[in-house]
Amino acid sequence: MDEEDQLIQPQDQSCWATLPDVCLRRVFWWLGDRDRSRAALVCRKWNQMMYSADLWRYRTITFSGRPSRVHASEFESALWYVKKFGRYLEHLEIKFLNPYNAVLTKKFQVTMRGLLSCLGKSNNRLKSLSIQHLELDRLVWRNSIRSSFMKSLSFFLKKMGKHLNYLSLKGARLTTEQGCHILNALSYLRNESTVTELNIEDCFSHHLAVYSSPQFNKTMATFRNLVSLTLNYNCISDELLENLCDNNTGTLRTMNIKCHIHDPHGQVIWGMSWAKLARHATSLKVNFFFERVMKYERLARILLQEIPIRSISLRSCYFSDPDWSMRPTLTDLLPTFRHTLQKLTFEFNNNHESLDEELHLLILSCRKLFYFKIWAFLDVKFVERILKSREEGQCALRTLKVRIYTNRYETNEEDRTLREIYRKYRKLIDSELNYFVIAYPMM
């Protein structure tokens, strides 16, 4: 018996060598790429495990937008991965973080051209693709680089669009024409797309009135199987709602709509358009996210009573306007949706007005409300009132997150009161609530 035969005798092997495949696969699943590569050198069985499809179905590839020796190999390793294991991919997420200059955007574009080309040739099972926050309208994206990247992406989507269920181009920042060109690639030669979840939030650049574009409405008419749609309010029009009603009523369940102060949002939408969509898409729930759009007059034009609203987020990002009041929104507008509202998120600077009573009454009126988050100037006793109402069964909250702004640097008094409130309602909080409350100096 030679030396090699002696090495593989069962009595001389480690217990790791006979580890069942299901256990070994789980071990590999938790390892990073570098450790997986090292583990694959242990023996033939471990090397074969490296090619298990389960290990490579999900992948997030992150490219740093800053020149660095530490990140120098990111582009090469991404290509290596796709060439080696790309055929197993089902869910791919690409991140390119804050590109610093045109040299890096060019390197990213060339890498993506190779990556998408290789993936298009070897993969026929990709279900989900996410390429977020590219901000292609920035100056670091020269016209030639941007055009080349879009050409590669469009060609890839034409080939792989029939497999995709999910596509996110969040933060791409394209012109209306460019964005529609990319989205049309999904329905190439088929006149309709199979995508069920589409995220085009911030896909188009700020200041664009996308809702007035016939090209955009024609493009959206190719989506016939949408379950979830995420977009900006500057894309919403009566025509879009009509398209959704005609083509997606049997499937559409969720619409996430972002409205930013810099996006055009003065268009007139008829309540009957929303009512028709809600009547046909009976499972539809709409979630609104407002950023610095806080005035009652603007909100009232957007939040029509015919909309089946599930959640509303209002964030002013610390901006203060002494001529603005949140009170009419809390007392007159939001109670309109008390039968459907389940989540409320507020972040505003109300240093000039107290809103504790109005907020409390709003929570009590929304009987389905289970999530409430607020960052604002509040009295500490507001938290105790909410907990008391919850204990008495007057509201259905399961999540309560509060940041209480104060005008003092020291929050010792507020902290002490909050500890007393916690001790008083500890049993309720620990057993039934996702609870986080803190006092925060707003200097």
From Swiss-Prot:
InterPro entries xref list: F-box-like_dom_sf (IPR036047), F-box_dom (IPR001810), FBXO31/39 (IPR045048), LRR_dom_sf (IPR032675)
Gene name of the encoded protein: FBXO39
Known partners and oligomeric status: Directly interacts with SKP1 and CUL1.
Protein name as catalogued: F-box only protein 39
Pfam families for the chain: F-box-like (PF12937)
Biological process according to GO: SCF-dependent proteasomal ubiquitin-dependent protein catabolic process
SUPFAM superfamilies reported in the protein's UniProt record: F-box domain, RNI-like
GO cellular component, one term: SCF ubiquitin ligase complex
Domain F-box, residue spans: 16-61
Keywords: Ubl conjugation pathway
Transmembrane domains' residue ranges: none
Job of this protein: Substrate-recognition component of the SCF (SKP1-CUL1-F-box protein)-type E3 ubiquitin ligase complex.
